[in-house]
């Protein structure tokens, strides 16, 4: 199994239906050597194959295989800011949220000893960029939660996030407003502790 095989499998995905994503994700799951190529293809940002690669990368990271991304954290965090297809940004925003959840977990894990300050900064910086530029609701929702979680350790993040939510996001769709209100309540709750 090589990169060309993975490209062929990705091209065979007709749409984002679960069964299509499951089929290709299972191929990668059963041939872990393809994961390197999956990360690489996710960041071919001018090629639409990156969208399908991002879908599968998200599936892998949200179905118990998040640690597989550990050796690729540099590549992932350095390149997420270059994504420009909406359908590739959303899955990567969700992966960022998953990374933030695991990193800030009370349960000791590999991410806490592997994820660097530079990598966190790259995720945070990209997250703020995603919040100030036009993005889909899901990207905003995942990103607000990611920034809240990393803001538990970076003092400057909560006030910036709070400002963005109150001045911009709260004036957007009902979904953004609801998630923004939830994140604001988490920030306030944490400030009282």
Model feature map: region roles:
Residues 1-193:
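Alpha-helical scaffold domains
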